[in-house]
């Protein structure tokens, strides 16, 4: 039986995913499957192939994400897989499109003598990729604030949490998948405007790409 941790930054990103997976909120910002919650009382069969799924809402930004994910990992059994789901901006990727992140960089990291965006401590390892040609694989840069302009010209995504998740997954040796829906092309005004559109706002459709068993 596989233990899967899904990570979202905001409740508005997480709530419909939790509903579709039939997860219960057991404490603020933490949801678990009923089977996971009642496993001991029901003497749940450990050979069952279904996954135990937990959903954690970390808050926005790399710092909050690092703090809340670290607390979770210290207090709970290590997951077999972490899946990060959320919105991302992009230089040129179509709004409303799902992408699978192949690698993530720290957007603010610029230290003399070191490669820009790449922390020697880790966090920029390659992520797990879905075996699905329908979803594009792209790199992502994690910033501590909303990116509205950039010198980066490549076909990439921008978020505010993934590098912290990746760094901790590398430290704890946990496989990481990240699926991002493009919410804007580096425009904060368009971000809020686009999220009014159902096909952009909804995130639960990403579950169709995942095998959670």
What is each PLM-predicted segment?
Residues 1-5, 14, 51-53, 80:
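Extreme N-terminal starter segment of soluble prokaryotic enzymes
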Residues 4-24, 29:
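N-terminal beta1-alpha1 ligand-phosphate binding loop
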Residues 27-30, 47-49:
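Short, ordered beta-strand-loop transition motifs
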Residues 35-213:
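Glycine-rich phosphate- or other oxyanion-binding loops that anchor nucleotides, phosphorylated ligands
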């Amino acid at each position: 039986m596989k233990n899967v941790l899904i990570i979202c930054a905001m409740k508005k990103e997480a709530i419909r995913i939790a509903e579709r997976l039939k997860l219960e909120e057991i404490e603020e910002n933490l949801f678990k499957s009923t089977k996971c919650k009642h496993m001991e009382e029901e003497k749940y069969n450990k050979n069952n192939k279904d996954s135990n799924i937990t959903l954690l809402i970390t808050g926005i930004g790399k710092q909050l994400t690092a703090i809340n994910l670290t607390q979770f990992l210290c207090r709970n059994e290590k997951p077999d897989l972490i899946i990060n789901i959320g919105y991302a901006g992009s230089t040129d990727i179509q709004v409303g499109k799902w992408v699978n992140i192949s690698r993530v960089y720290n957007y603010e990291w610029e230290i003399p003598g070191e490669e820009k965006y790449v922390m020697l401590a880790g966090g920029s390892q390659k992520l797990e990729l879905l075996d699905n040609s329908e979803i594009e694989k792209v790199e992502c840069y994690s910033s501590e604030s909303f990116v509205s302009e950039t010198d980066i010209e490549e076909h990439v995504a921008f978020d505010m949490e993934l590098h912290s998740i990746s760094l901790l997954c590398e430290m704890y040796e946990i496989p990481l998948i990240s699926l991002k829906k493009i919410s804007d092309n580096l425009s904060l005004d368009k971000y809020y405007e686009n999220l009014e559109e159902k096909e952009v706002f909804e995130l639960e459709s990403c579950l169709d790409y995942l095998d959670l068993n």
